[in-house]
Amino acid sequence: EKILCTVQKWCRPYPWTVKVAQGLSHFGEHSLGWLVLSGLAALTFPKHREQWGLAALSAFGSHALAVIIKRIVWRPRPHHPAIDVNVKTPSALSFPSSHATSTTSWATSAATISHNPLPLVLSPIMMTSRMIAGVHYPTDVAAGAALGAVSSVVTHKWGPAVLQRLRSRKNH
């Protein structure tokens, strides 16, 4: 709670940080923002359509996996008088952060597809926003980021082979 309280204390003089955190919360809810961006990227870059489809699959799949893990771990969200909760959440469970998971998954996918590390900055931005919003501990967002990165790597490593097998079965 100490780190979470410190993050919020640093941000209090800058009310815009709460507005940004709230906006990111809506964007990342159920990985919908990342699904939309994947669709737009697939339309914009048709040569990489399959890869952007895998990015969407990874973001959504990792989000779903994070929700399952939340129901196993059953860690409650932060609850402390010094912590301001600035967004509504669909559940009272905290570990891991689904927002950090799907964001890191998508950012890792985007960096892989574009051969550019710049999308990776999205992950710490979302991680910090979840603490500014007062709904996650640092370990929640760190675990979510790790889960998202692994999900993306696994999806892009094995996804093309799985798709190829599905296509070959369809043609037989």
Show the residue positions of the predicted features.
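Alpha-helical membrane-inserting segments
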Residues: 40, 65, 69, 73, ...
